[in-house]
């Protein structure tokens, strides 16, 4: 079976700065892949290229055998920052992708309500973003991305602005939602434990130029609960990935101080 998402010899430069170099990836349908690496290794740039929001300088991205040349409804994007429209209700924010596509009927409205229930927001349909906590707003962002029924879900550090406790709750909620539909997910994070908890594979990026250092298969049983983070096997995965990026992380910290 052909890969759902095929990335071949992907490169990206900004003037003289080479941000990404020769990234190759074959992603299967229903696979959950996380991307980790030090600051400045091009993780977000990589995700934006896959989303069609940023052109590649070299190489190609194919989804179901078709070249990605721009944004499309076959990809849903959950951003790091909260970008809900403050004057729209939870329901109106969640269904906006369907409105843009000109496809809003009874079926789409029912599906949006089902998704809000799936992400734990049943009863909050008529609330506005200012009335919601950070975790609840990210649930709306997730429902909005799922409402267009994307083939691939792209997530750029969606829980980074949340406190530690809320972040762990959102990780378990994302796992529950993913298990229910098995979307193909590409998830960028700085948190190694988050990557190991969520993913089937973790792509470890090296810095400048950003390149794939290692693809780590995570052979932990599913479904996963937070208790798995206390197991020796989980800790071994986290330690292995940390050792892969430790030197680059230290170099990034020193560079930021200069």
Task: Describe the function of each predicted region.
Residues 91-101, 109, 217:
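Short helical segment in ABC ATPase nucleotide-binding domains corresponding to the A-loop/adjacent helical element
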Residues 36-38:
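The feature captures the beta-strand-to-loop junction immediately N-terminal to the Walker
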Residues 153-156:
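Catalytic Walker B motif of ABC-type/P-loop ATPase nucleotide-binding domains
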């Amino acid at each position: 079976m052909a890969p759902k998402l095929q990335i071949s010899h992907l490169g990206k430069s900004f003037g003289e700065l080479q941000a990404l170099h020769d990234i190759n990836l074959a992603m299967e349908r229903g696979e959950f892949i996380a991307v980790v690496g030090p600051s400045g290794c091009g993780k977000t740039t990589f995700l934006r290229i896959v989303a069609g929001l940023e052109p590649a300088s070299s190489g190609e991205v194919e989804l179901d055998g078709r070249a990605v040349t721009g944004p499309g409804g076959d990809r849903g994007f959950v951003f790091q920052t909260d970008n809900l429209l403050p004057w729209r209700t939870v329901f109106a924010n969640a269904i906006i992708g369907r409105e843009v596509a000109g496809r809003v009927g009874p079926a789409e409205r029912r599906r949006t309500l089902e998704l809000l229930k799936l992400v734990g927001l049943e009863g909050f349909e008529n609330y506005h973003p200012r009335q919601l906590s950070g975790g609840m707003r990210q649930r709306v962002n997730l429902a909005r991305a799922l409402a267009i029924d994307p083939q691939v879900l792209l997530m750029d550090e969606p829980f980074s602005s949340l406190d530690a406790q809320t972040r762990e709750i959102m990780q378990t909620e994302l796992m529950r939602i993913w298990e229910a539909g098995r979307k193909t997910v590409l998830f960028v994070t700085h948190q190694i434990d988050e990557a190991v908890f969520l993913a089937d594979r973790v792509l470890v990026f090296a810095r400048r130029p950003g390149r794939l250092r290692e693809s780590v298969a995570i052979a932990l049983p599913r479904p996963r609960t937070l208790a798995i983070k206390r197991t020796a096997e989980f800790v071994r995965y986290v330690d292995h990935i940390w050792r892969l990026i430790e030197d680059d992380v230290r170099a990034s910290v020193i560079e930021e101080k200069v």
